């Protein structure tokens, strides 16, 4: 089951992909945009629950193992820049907490923002914000952490 670590990018990737898709939604499809954003956040929440179960041992004890997935981003001469993501018990708990609270915010916003004409833009930026926050949690390279931090600032 630890092979799933190579797919952990889906947790922040789904909200970011949702933000990109929502940016092309027409302003008249307000309810569809809200349900689409909530659906992508719900899938991220389910994926974070899977990561949480991976980070915990089947005997109920918390594992101290850090699972990482690295790949080469680019090579410059003899220098190789490798980036990736990691999963340990602490960020597994944080992934569950952030995706759960984000999902609650997304669901609450359906009713709260239903009369706002810019709800599609709201959900696009909210999805981008949630994806960047989740990217902060799984990054294992300072450059990716900084990029996600800047996107959080941009989306807020």
Regions found by a protein language model. Name each.
Residues 40-43, 101, 129, 149-153:
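Transmembrane alpha-helical core residues of multi-pass small-molecule transporters
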Residues 9, 93, 134, 143-144:
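Beta-sheet entry/capping signal
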Residues 20-24, 133-138:
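Alpha-helical transmembrane segments of multipass membrane proteins
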Residues 46-50, 132-135, 155:
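Transmembrane-helix signature of multi-pass solute transporters
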Residues 15, 88, 126, 135-156:
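Functional transmembrane alpha-helices
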Residues 1-7, 13, 25-96, 100-124:
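Transmembrane helix-loop-helix hairpins at membrane boundaries of multipass inner-membrane proteins
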Residues 12-27, 155:
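N-terminal signal-anchor/start-transfer transmembrane helix
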């Amino acid at each position: 089951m630890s092979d799933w670590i190579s797919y952990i990018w889906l947790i922040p990737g789904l909200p970011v992909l949702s933000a990109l898709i929502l940016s092309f939604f027409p302003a008249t499809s307000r309810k569809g945009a809200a349900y689409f954003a909530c659906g992508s956040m719900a899938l991220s929440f389910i994926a974070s629950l899977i990561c949480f179960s991976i980070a915990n041992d089947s005997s109920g004890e918390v594992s101290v193992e850090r699972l990482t997935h690295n790949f080469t981003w680019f090579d410059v001469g003899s220098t190789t820049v490798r980036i990736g993501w990691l999963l340990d018990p602490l960020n597994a708990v944080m992934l569950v907490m952030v995706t759960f609270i984000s999902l609650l915010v997304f669901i609450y916003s359906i009713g709260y923002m239903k009369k706002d004409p810019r709800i599609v833009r709201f959900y696009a930026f909210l999805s981008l914000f949630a994806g960047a926050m989740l990217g902060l949690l799984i990054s294992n390279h300072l450059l990716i952490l900084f990029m996600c931090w800047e996107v959080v600032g941009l989306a807020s």
